[in-house]
């Protein structure tokens, strides 16, 4: 049977990595910016455990929405696509013992993804919005995640008082200053984020950030080892995913 995976533009490498790690006998036929064609004897419904593509279809025109998550019933404006959240977790190279911080958690798509599909130890979810925290709580309940594996805080990033250096990874969908916030606000917010990371991140910790503010993120993290991993086409915007580590 021939299949087509619909993917986010810029995510080929990660979709192929997931597909071939879970189904190593897959025969890749063709690759394009927004789709991958492959052949396999496996039935289409078995591919529901692929989380980085957005859709899969077969030659009989049956289509599955792979980005839909049953637990994700609450949403926030400018929230992250669940497939993209999964890709960011792949880039972070998550481990079971990791403690994750998302300081702009929205409805907690990234933290829930990290716990459910990468089995990390625990996550700390922070957002300035009361509504986001309420929606996060509901999504965690929907996902049936034990309460001792997550903490939710309604805080402005400038008011976060955590000081213990025990965070293994920070993953976040940052304010772009386009759909949410402004560039001037982002200068302050991103500067505070760098200070927070410097305070809380372990020596060998990792930071994975999605942002449209490409120049700003490089300026703010100029004393870190920062790399742009890929540019993603997300609804007409072209943010980049940055991987950042201590020098």
Spans of model-derived segments:
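Class I S-adenosyl-L-methionine-dependent methyltransferase catalytic core
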Residues: 1-23, 29-44, 60-247
